[in-house]
């Protein structure tokens, strides 16, 4: 019989080996359980209390959201649509209350006619869209990864697995916006059934209205994948895709929206409702983590109360951080146009060793970022691309403002530009971070002073 080491393994074999050694060294299974808890606690202390977390796809949830994620209701099954006649299981009347509150709150937050809350991740929401609105062999258009596109709308994600032909949306690699003239020439040639506007490097709005006018000539639809921008959309600090001509919107509740990890689907057109909801259930969701749904409803209520102030500060912080990094010798994309209109900025760190090396160096000093492709990179540069993606969601929720962004830029520049040691900078990061331990823009702690 083959050993684990001899098998094909996608995970890091050394880390798995250490895990097996921990299990084998434990006196009993209760001790194994304590090891799991210990690892979780270590992460909570390091990432939750000691790090400057600048990952664009992360957001810390409020105490109320975290409490609901561990609620008893999470052990209950709720297969199907809301309502006694729609459920397979009995005993769901209070679950119906929770789910209906969630749906109506989402519709209120996003000013839309329909909302679905049942996806555990926004990528699954994207899969729903492709299942509902396309057929195998259809052509779609989406953004290529080097200029910001995400895999879920490409060949190696749900779009590709659905058997779709994928054509690149032309993007200006300097302006980091859709090249509308080239799009208007290309789209009529390929006649996409769906145009997927999804970005992992999401800095600026799309010309949705103009693109929708073009594809409507042959019945094409616009799909806005707002995984990163969802909170900004809700608060009015980013374009409203549905109002500008998008037919359907997906998004992640766990990024700018700052709720539990969830996928959200939004639309206004009743003619697509059956196709979308049939794809949600029974294709992509059965029982759907009602504890998560409760937490999502709670976070939507929080967002209605605090979202505008929160998103406003997130964007201000991102623009301030981009400017501060540029001033300290770290080249930033789109510096000629204010760096960003969202929570993200992108650094060109090729001269400092590339995105992988820089992210590792910053991590050693308790500053958490991620490597990112630049428009000048190729697909072959994925392992060590030239860019670094930086986000301001978490630092904003901890009460930081523009002045703190200058301090964070100082830490990064001390490492990359001035060449100080990670040990020295890391100690200063710990001292800095110790002053920011309260999460704001939530019912428990309100707004920062």
Where are these regions (language model features)?
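PLP-dependent enzyme catalytic core of the Aspartate aminotransferase-like
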Residues: 2-11, 104, 316, 381-449
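Conserved small-domain helix->loop->beta segment predominantly found in fold-type I
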Residues: 300, 311, 315-360, 368-384, ...
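Short, well-ordered beta-strand elements within core beta-sheets of diverse protein domains
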Residues: 54-58, 344-351, 396-397
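A common structural junction motif
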Residues: 364-369, 416
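Short Gly/Ser/Thr- and Asp/Glu-enriched loop/turn motifs at secondary-structure junctions
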Residues: 49, 120, 291, 337-343
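Conserved PLP-enzyme active-site core in the AAT-like
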Residues: 6-12, 17-26, 94-97, 101-331, ...
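N-terminal glycine-rich, Lys/His-bearing helix-loop that initiates the first secondary-structure elements
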Residues: 1-86, 90-101, 213, 434, ...
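Flexible, glycine/charged-enriched surface loops at secondary-structure junctions
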Residues: 82-83, 287-290, 307-313, 325-337, ...
């Amino acid at each position: 019989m083959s050993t684990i080491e001899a098998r094909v393994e996608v995970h890091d074999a050394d880390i798995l080996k250490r895990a097996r050694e921990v299990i084998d060294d434990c006196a009993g299974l209760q001790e194994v359980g304590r090891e799991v808890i210990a690892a979780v606690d270590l992460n909570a202390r390091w990432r939750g209390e000691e790090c400057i977390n600048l990952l664009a796809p992360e957001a810390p949830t409020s105490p109320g959201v975290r409490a609901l994620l561990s609620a008893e209701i999470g052990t209950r099954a709720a297969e199907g649509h809301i309502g006694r006649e729609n459920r397979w299981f009995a005993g769901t009347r209070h679950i119906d209350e929770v789910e209906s509150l969630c749906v109506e709150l989402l519709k209120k937050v996003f000013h839309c006619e329909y909302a679905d809350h049942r996806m555990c991740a926004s990528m699954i929401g994207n899969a729903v869209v492709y299942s509902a609105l396309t057929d195998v062999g259809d052509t779609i258009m989406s953004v290529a990864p080097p200029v910001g596109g995400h895999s879920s709308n490409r060949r190696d994600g749900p779009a590709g697995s659905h058997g779709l032909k994928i054509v690149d949306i032309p993007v200006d690699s300097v302006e980091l916006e859709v090249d509308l003239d080239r799009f208007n020439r290309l789209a009529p040639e390929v006649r996409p059934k769906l145009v997927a506007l999804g970005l992992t490097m999401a800095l600026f709005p799309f010309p949705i209205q103009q693109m929708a006018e073009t594809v409507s000539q042959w019945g094409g639809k616009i799909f806005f994948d707002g995984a990163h921008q969802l909170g900004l959309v809700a608060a009015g600090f980013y374009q409203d895709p549905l109002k500008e001509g998008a037919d359907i919107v997906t998004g992640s509740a766990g990024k700018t929206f700052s709720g539990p990890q969830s996928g959200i689907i939004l639309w206004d057109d009743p003619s697509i409702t059956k196709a979308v909801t049939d794809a949600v259930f029974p294709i992509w969701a059965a029982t759907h983590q009602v504890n998560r749904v409760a937490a999502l409803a709670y976070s939507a209520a929080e967002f209605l109360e605090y979202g505008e102030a929160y998103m406003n500060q997130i964007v201000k912080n991102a623009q301030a951080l981009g400017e501060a990094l540029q001033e300290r010798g770290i080249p930033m994309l789109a510096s000629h146009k204010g760096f960003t209109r969202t929570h993200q900025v992108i650094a060109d760190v090729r001269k400092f060793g590339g995105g992988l090396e820089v992210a590792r160096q910053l991590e050693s000093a308790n500053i958490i970022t991620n490597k990112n492709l630049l428009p000048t990179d190729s697909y072959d540069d994925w392992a060590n691309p030239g860019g670094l993606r930086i986000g301001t969601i978490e630092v904003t929720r901890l009460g930081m403002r523009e002045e703190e962004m200058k301090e964070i830029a100082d830490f990064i520049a001390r490492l990359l530009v001035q060449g100080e040691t990670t040990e020295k900078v890391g100690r200063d990061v710990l001292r800095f971070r110790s002053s920011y331990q309260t999460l704001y823009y939530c019912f428990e702690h309100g707004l920062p002073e």
